[in-house]
Amino acid sequence: EGKSFPYVFNIGTGCPWTSLFKKSLIDENKLEFMALSRSNDIYFVNMALVLAKRITMLPEVLVNYRQRSTSLQANNTKTPWDWYEALKAIRDKLKELDLYDTVETSFKNLAFGVNIYNLCSLKVGEAFCEIYERLNSEIFAEFELDDFTEEECYSYNGAKYQIYMQMKECSAVEYLFRQAQEMKEWQ
């Protein structure tokens, strides 16, 4: 069962097009996409995983992912908080179903990865700074990530953990300055 698997939220991507779901699972649990412009699939996929009676993974690559400059993900500055709303909805539903404690570490790694990924995927400095500061001032604490340790962090989030540690030390402007300095030294 999904809820008994300790890495349930971390076995794949949050994209529905990389998975097949039984219609009965969707119907029985009244699973729907959220009414969001972006990240509307995060809730659907992750709740389907945790509520599934069985999860089967195939070793073959069946889907190729392409990025385009006109995709919703490429233009996430237009709706920069949708991922946050999706994560809150998952957390709240897990608590409502009394499943949160069972999958807490897996959920924290999901939230951690989604937080940092969405921050780093922004292409507008103002949005980056706004999200960066809000992550540090309230969102990390809201998802119980303000004291997230390297031991809790799953290996696939390793590079994101290094970003997180830098974020805890400085403001958005200082972080960006440090990144510019590192690029200068690299060249």
Please report, for each region that a protein language model flagged, where it lies by residue.
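Hydrophobic/aromatic-lined pockets within catalytic cores
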Residues: 53, 95, 120
